[in-house]
Amino acid sequence: MFVNSDFSDLLRLFNDNHVRYLVIGGYAVIQYAEPRYTKDLDMWISTDTNNAAAVYRALKAFGAPLVGLTEADFAEEGYFYQMGFPPVRVDILMGIPGGDFEQAWNNRNEVDFDGLVVSFISRQDLIDSKKASGRPQDLIDADNLSHI
């Protein structure tokens, strides 16, 4: 499903480090609807301190550029971290418009891709977050997801 093996490698490291993450954005839309172009892998993470430390460890093991960053940065609600360039960019978000991570985590959909279990935001939570964002592409995605 993922256009680049780096995405799978990163998700595997997140799983190995017990990171609580949800795939959101274009890849989540693709999971529930028809394929469409996406320029990045968007992940929403829990901002609790243990999870932030796990994210930092996983990113360090991945070889991500972390100069000037600390574990605490990944516990800051509203912060985001970006690495790479489209179409293999990764965006890690510590909050999304209208989102409650704990609720979304409880509603998550886990999908097994040849032994790699990936946590996706639920279809309904994805629709709600797309509507809350208000961006034109997100509103189109929400409408498409609502008619499945």
Feature-to-residue mapping (PLM):
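Compositionally biased terminal segments of proteins
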Residues: 1-148
